[in-house]
């Protein structure tokens, strides 16, 4: 059975906290992130981990649609409070996209956009460097690997509030 994360969460990364008066988790209290705020719907354990693996590597897009619809309902109030204008799925490197045939983050983003009546923009950011799978890297290697992996596309609109969608938040 799927159980969404509930209770007190870190203001920055959405990780569950032990004490109500805490605002930030240990990691977020000592490290600066490149994003202002995040929200996680589920913890990364079975059956979530298994279904995301199936979505990513076995074209089980129905899982992405389910997670997108669920996330839209679960996070609707927060997304409205943030005044999100567009959803931007984290892009894959062109070679990975060609191999997989689709971007799993885009599947989730499109399902969310459908429920929230928000546009999904897939050409705002480009993946310019192919990186190793992040799960194989330590925190310092992840940060270094991603520093030059993305570039904003030219001539893009200037939105104030965007929601960048990724399947997994890898904590440091």
Please provide the spans of the model-predicted regions.
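Glycine-rich phosphate/pyrophosphate-handling loop used in enzymes and phosphotransfer proteins
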Residues: 1-171
